[in-house]
Amino acid sequence: MGSEHDSCRELLSVAYELAAGATDSRGRAVAAVLAAHGALEALVNKVGGEEIASFNYRARFLPKWHDLCERTLGRQLEAAPDLERLQALRDAALGFRGEPERLDRRSLTPPPEIPAEVGAGEARWAVETARRVIAEFHAATGRELPDWL
């Protein structure tokens, strides 16, 4: 898919490097979560802008994913709960307090828990989740998987 995913690729690469060195650094763990989240935000902005004429780049992260998946797939990804948890991790890293954001506010499933701390385990999980979401989205939409994934 070439250069269209440069930001996504670069952010995911940074997230991986940060997560690998996060064992004794909360700052690196937080940065890894933010970079993994940013990689997915870059992807949804790029693909959403190409696929949806009225795509709102300024919308929040989860509503953009919800809109993109509904319009391109007619459904949400199997990884939807992981997207919600990644958003909750990002919020925790930034000091957000309150109810976690949902992909679908009407959902009857319990919302993700917001962790008290963001550490190395959460950083590794965030990077792997971003990789899984990118792979699932490409497979579900019939797009070629990027060679850097």
Model-derived regions, located:
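Amphipathic, well-ordered alpha-helical segments in soluble domains
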Residues: L11-V14, A35, L89, T129
